[in-house]
């Protein structure tokens, strides 16, 4: 009996060590680590946090803007701040990036940090931290952000083709995510960022009036939701008008986005497909805690997936640079 308990204790200790090893691997990523600036610029993270909070208080739309910007940065050439670079043919000029916002928030934080820690903190890290702080500003859960990224020196609009599109099938979405080392759960979790933010009428109009050139709406749209969307985005109305991606909860980081998918009230075609495809529907159900399935806590899993995404093709050590100004290479 004593040997039995001893074996159980050893096994329990092994499992704890294994879990810790997994968490450490997740946090450290490819040369990044939590607290990278703790000795070289200890105020960096608090400056980013306060800057995001100040801008959010005057304009809540910066939160989804920054979160989307970080996603777009990581999916193109890795998380290296290349989305921040200005230029006639830079990433931010590509069609999927033309409505990004929050550049001023990142530059504001960078200016403050440079004043006390010149040449230390990368723009890529500021963006990663600001994305986390944007979720917190909208009442989402926090997570530890590994830092230590360096800034890239290449930014090309042509590379934006790696980004998932609003009309992509689930198979295409999964392929694009898998290419970046992200699995199906990561896909559903990260797309859950659409719980905050908006989309332009231009990207949903065909879905409302001429889906797949049928002359009618997407049949997956709930019958009571369709007239609401059509009222917001008339067939010949303002294509630039914005529509909330999470009806009724556009400014709160919560699971109502997934409830909307279950009820046929997803705004984007690619979002609603997460419910109609069995391989992704199961994760939507698990985030909703549907009985009979092993539940997943959305806020926790979102943070885990964000850490994975934030370590895509990062530049560390002597690769890249630390920009003096986020919008231009040194």
Curated annotation (Swiss-Prot):
Cleaved signal peptide residues: 1-29
Residue numbers annotated as active site: 72
Binding positions for substrate per the UniProt entry: 164
Pfam family, one: peroxidase
One BP term from GO: hydrogen peroxide catabolic process
Any one annotated GO CC term: plant-type cell wall
Note describing how the cofactor binds: Binds 2 calcium ions per subunit. Binds 1 heme b (iron(II)-protoporphyrin IX) group per subunit.
Protein name as catalogued: Peroxidase N1
Organism from which the protein derives: Nicotiana tabacum (Common tobacco)
Entry-annotated residues carrying Pyrrolidone carboxylic acid: 30
Site (Transition state stabilizer): 68
InterPro entries in the cross-refs: Haem_peroxidase, Haem_peroxidase_sf, Peroxidase_pln, Peroxidases_AS, Peroxidases_heam-ligand_BS, Secretory_peroxidase
Reactions catalysed: 2 a phenolic donor + H2O2 = 2 a phenolic radical donor + 2 H2O
Activity profile over pH: Optimum pH is 4.7.
Residue numbers binding heme b: 194
Glycosylation sites: 212
UniProt keyword Calcium, yes or no: yes
């Amino acid at each position: 009996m004593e040997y039995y308990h001893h074996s159980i204790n050893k096994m329990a200790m092994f499992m704890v060590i294994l879990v810790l090893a997994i968490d450490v691997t997740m946090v450290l990523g490819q040369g990044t680590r939590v607290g990278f600036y703790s000795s070289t610029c200890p105020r960096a993270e608090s400056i980013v946090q306060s800057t995001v909070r100040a801008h959010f208080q005057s304009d809540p739309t910066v939160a989804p803007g920054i979160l989307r910007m970080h996603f777009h940065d990581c999916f193109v050439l890795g998380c290296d701040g290349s989305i921040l670079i200005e230029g006639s043919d830079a990433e931010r000029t590509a069609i999927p990036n033309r409505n990004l916002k929050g550049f001023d928030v990142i530059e504001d934080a960078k200016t403050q940090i440079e004043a006390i820690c010149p040449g230390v903190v990368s723009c890529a890290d500021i963006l990663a931290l600001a994305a986390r702080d944007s979720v917190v500003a909208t009442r989402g859960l926090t997570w530890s952000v590994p830092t230590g990224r360096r800034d890239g020196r290449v930014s090309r609009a042509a590379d934006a083709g790696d980004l998932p599109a609003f009309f992509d099938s689930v198979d295409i979405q999964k392929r694009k995510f898998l290419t970046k080392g992200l699995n199906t759960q990561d896909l559903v979790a990260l797309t859950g960022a659409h719980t905050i933010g908006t989309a332009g009428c231009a990207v949903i109009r065909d879905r409302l009036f001429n889906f797949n050139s049928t002359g009618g709406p997407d049949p997956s749209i709930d019958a009571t939701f369709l007239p609401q969307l059509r009222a917001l985005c008339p067939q010949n109305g303002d294509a630039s008008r914005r529509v909330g991606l999470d009806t009724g909860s556009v400014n709160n980081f919560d699971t109502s986005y997934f409830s909307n998918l279950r009820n046929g009230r997803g705004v984007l075609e690619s979002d609603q497909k997460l419910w109609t495809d069995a391989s992704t529907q199961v994760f939507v159900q698990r985030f909703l805690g549907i009985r009979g399935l092993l539940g997943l806590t959305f806020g926790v899993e979102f943070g885990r997936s964000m850490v994975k995404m934030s370590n895509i093709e990062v530049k560390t050590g002597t690769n890249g640079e630390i920009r003096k100004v986020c919008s231009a290479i040194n």
